[in-house]
A protein has these predicted regions:
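Conserved N-terminal beta1-alpha1 strand-loop-helix module at the mouth
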Residues: 2-80, 84-86, 101-102
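A mid-sequence interfacial segment
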Residues: 13-15, 20, 109-144, 149
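Catalytic cores of alpha/beta
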Residues: 41-44, 91-96, 138-144, 161-169, ...
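Short loop/helix-cap segments at secondary-structure boundaries that form the rim of catalytic
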Residues: 43-47, 113-118, 165, 187-188, ...
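Glycine-rich phosphate-binding active-site loops on the catalytic face of alpha/beta enzymes
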Residues: 52-58, 111-112, 154-157, 177-205
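Alpha-helix-loop-beta-strand connector modules within alpha/beta enzyme cores
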Residues: 63-82, 90-91, 98-100, 114-126, ...
Length: 205
């Protein structure tokens, strides 16, 4: 499996720069807008959020959506696991990276994290945490895949596991899932999350 040690230096440098640029923007506005419905995109484009996460969009709609985001100076991420009509494999990753030109790919699968890294886009590994067993399995998956960013869901779990995750894997953390109120956003940020991801329009500044 790919790791930073055996990824070509040009890839590592380019993606490191993209990650640094993203988190410089998150330092100012620590919110990524999650788009489940196309009608929400204009509001996200008009907001100050530096990144937009696409989930559940049909594959044949993705190009114009991603390009509209990038035209506004924002970064576009696609959750490959949830995109209808797109292979959940290396070919699907290559299509998003090379044909669409996404800034990053979100996935729960370690193999797709490696594929995203190989294709020189930001790799975000989503961790769905429900119990202690799931936490330890997730930690092993992150250690194996070495993503650029970890997204922890649901947000209510993060304060309970934040110290363990940061101790084992010092990569930037985004928190999402059921972030619907300002106090939930602030709780995640206070526990060390660099940003939150949410589809709640009222939380997009």
């Amino acid at each position: 499996m790919a790791s930073r040690a055996n990824v070509p230096p040009a890839r590592a440098q380019a993606v490191d720069q993209s990650v640094a640029r993203l988190f410089e923007a998150f330092d100012r506005v620590p919110v990524a807008a999650v788009i489940r419905h196309a009608e929400d995109l204009p509001r996200a484009l008009a907001s100050q959020v530096p990144a937009i996460f696409f989930v559940r969009a049909p594959a044949f709609h993705l190009g114009p959506l991603v390009w509209a985001v990038q035209a506004r100076g924002k970064m576009a991420f696609v959750h490959i696991d949830l995109i209808a009509g797109l292979g959940k494999d290396r070919a699907g990753v290559a299509f998003l990276a090379r044909e669409i030109g996404v800034n990053g790919i979100i996935t729960s699968h370690s193999g797709l994290v490696a594929a995203a890294r190989a294709d020189r886009v930001i790799a975000v590994q989503r961790l769905l945490l429900y119990d202690d067993l799931g936490l330890h399995s997730a930690m092993a998956a992150v250690e194996h895949a070495r993503p650029d960013i970890v997204e922890v869901q649901p947000a209510v779990i993060f304060p309970l596991v934040a110290d363990l995750i940061r101790a084992r894997h010092p990569v930037p953390i985004i928190v999402g899932g059921f972030v619907t109120e300002p106090h939930q956003r602030e709780a995640a940020l206070q526990r060390g999350a660099r940003a939150i991801s949410t589809s709640t329009v009222s939380l997009w500044p």
